[in-house]
């Protein structure tokens, strides 16, 4: 990651390592097994070019996690591609189908 961050001028504010227990309760579990996860806080310039740089940086991080059988936390941002969501959360399409079934008027919404 260091090489990627340097090559792409990604400004890492900090990273934390957290131990996460397996989630057996959620329909879309983040942790499918006990994980040691890394949370990155990246400096984002809140202008179009800065947001685009952060989008690409997070997509590269998601790809790196997916290649290792990991996931990413769905609600941290909306930068994941459709393929990344489907790769990390194979039941996502089923989740959307069930949501539509149980919430046909789509009252429960998120701008995520």
Language model features with spans:
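Generic, well-ordered alpha-helical scaffold segments in large soluble proteins
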Residues: 1-4, 8, 60, 64, ...
């Amino acid at each position: 990651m260091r090489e990627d961050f340097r090559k792409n001028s990604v400004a890492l504010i900090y990273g934390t390592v957290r131990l996460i227990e397996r989630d057996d309760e959620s329909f879309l579990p983040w942790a499918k097994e006990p994980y040691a996860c890394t949370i990155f806080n990246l400096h984002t310039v809140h202008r179009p070019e800065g947001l685009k740089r952060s989008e690409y940086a997070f997509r590269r991080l998601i790809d790196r996690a997916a290649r290792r059988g990991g996931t990413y936390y769905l609600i941290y941002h909306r930068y994941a591609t459709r393929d990344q969501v489907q790769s990390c959360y194979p039941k996502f399409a089923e989740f959307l189908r069930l949501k539509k079934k149980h919430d046909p008027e789509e009252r429960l919404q998120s701008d995520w």
